[in-house]
């Protein structure tokens, strides 16, 4: 792969990764600037907290899709190495998007899943499933993201991925952990916010402080 090909694939991946779906969709449908609420990131998890599950689902699919599109272009152009180069560009674009003035984007989790879907499909599916299971079990999106990203490199290796693909996913895992450093600090202090899962048939959200206080003050009736 020539230097020119590397540069072109990296730029193409970056432009695709820069599409800030979380910002655009939440702005269009809710009027909110997702960068001004919650974690201030444009990723799907922050969208879920402040725009609902349907919006989360759409943003997650689009963020996965842009990672897959970048990797697919790289794969078609220069094989697995090209997929890695374009995929890396997509991650950088999601983190510091061109269309938001190179300012803060997302934490690259969904886009990493999208790239992995092309270079290691089975590993990508397992990563996504693991993310969901950890989220349901702990209700911490940060714990789910860190756990799933750490599992990805060995999964890629287990499913027969090449060393460039393993190295790419290892680098992505390190980047994801670094982007969650504030979350890690809050977890260590016990101040990280749990995620309220409001889905049909799944009511694992914690009671509000007022409801909890009311429950604790409730006494049995006098007979």
Predicted regions and their residues:
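Topogenic membrane-insertion module of multi-pass membrane proteins
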Residues: 1-6, 19-22
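Nucleotide and nucleotide-moiety/phosphate-recognizing core
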Residues: 5, 9, 54-100, 119-122, ...
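Alpha-helical transmembrane segments
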Residues: 5-16, 171
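Interhelical loop and helix-boundary elements at the membrane-water interface
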Residues: 12, 16, 21-66, 94-110, ...
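Interfacial segments of multi-pass membrane proteins
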Residues: 48-51, 74-78, 89, 93, ...
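Membrane-interface helix-boundary signature
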Residues: 52-55, 79-83, 141, 162-168
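Loop-to-transmembrane alpha-helix initiation sites
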Residues: 125, 141-149, 160-172
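Alpha-helical transmembrane segments and their immediate juxtamembrane flanks
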Residues: 162-190
